């Protein structure tokens, strides 16, 4: 066992545990977007930055292992500024504010990132994929956190999703970019369950009827 201090709170935990684990044990909130406790830490979003005594710059809490005697601050001004800037950038690429129940909206609210985007500009405009009978994929809401891809790989083992592109052009594709319906998707819903933005959602009976009705009207 090792002991660390998080915002003045001493906690003991197993060697190799991450700073995020220590923060949770201490009852301290650290914002995350790419983290899911059911998956291996990824460290992609850089929202979970914290300050560590002696470290020259903030460190990602989800991938940084604790060291005995480490002193951690989850409310450091510089680390929090990094988190706020990342969330502001993410929101600036979305066509509309995220739904209030999503993790992204809740993180933004707790970080006081509200109102109009700080950096308005080009937003994602990608065609929806409603071809799957049970899952809807609204690409423009994707923030490339990688959680759906890892859920498909690590939890289900279907390997139906792939991260493609870089930077603003990064996205998630199913199969050989042929869509969910024609991929190796087994309709388990793990991707929808972990998505922090509702880019992937499970289709209810009402959703299906509404979408089929829209298609029929367009056909007329």
Region spans (language model):
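Eukaryote-biased recognition of intrinsically disordered, low-complexity regulatory segments
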Residues: 1-9
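Short low-complexity stretches enriched in small and charged residues
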Residues: 5, 27-29, 126-130
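Short glycine-rich loop/turn motifs that provide flexible caps or phosphate-binding loops at active sites
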Residues: 7, 15, 42, 164-166, ...
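Aromatic-flanked redox-active Cys/Sec active sites in thiol-based oxidoreductases
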Residues: 8, 36, 137-140
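N-terminal cofactor/phosphate-binding cores enriched in small/glycine residues
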Residues: 10-68, 82
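Fe-S ferredoxin-like electron-transfer domains
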Residues: 46, 55-187, 193-220
């Amino acid at each position: 066992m090792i002991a660390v201090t998080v915002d003045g709170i001493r906690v003991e935990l197993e060697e190799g545990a991450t700073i995020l684990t220590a923060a949770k044990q201490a009852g301290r909130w650290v914002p995350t977007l790419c983290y899911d406790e059911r998956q291996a830490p990824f460290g992609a979003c850089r929202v979970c930055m914290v300050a560590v005594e002696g470290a020259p710059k903030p460190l990602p809490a989800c991938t940084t292992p604790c060291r005995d005697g480490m002193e951690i601050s989850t409310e450091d001004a510089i680390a929090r500024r990094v988190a706020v800037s990342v969330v502001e950038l993410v929101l600036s690429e979305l066509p509309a504010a995220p739904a209030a129940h999503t993790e992204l909206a809740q993180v933004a609210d707790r970080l006081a990132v509200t109102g109009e985007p700080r950096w308005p500009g080009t937003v994602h405009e990608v065609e929806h994929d409603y071809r799957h009978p049970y899952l809807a994929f609204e690409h423009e809401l994707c923030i490339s956190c990688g959680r759906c891809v890892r859920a498909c790989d690590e939890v289900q083992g279907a390997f139906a999703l792939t991260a493609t592109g870089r930077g603003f052009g990064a996205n998630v594709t199913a199969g050989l970019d042929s869509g969910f319906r024609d991929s190796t998707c087994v309709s388990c819903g793990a991707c929808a369950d972990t998505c922090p933005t509702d880019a992937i959602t499970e289709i209810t009976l009402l959703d299906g009827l509404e979408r089929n009705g829209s298609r029929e009207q367009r056909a007329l």
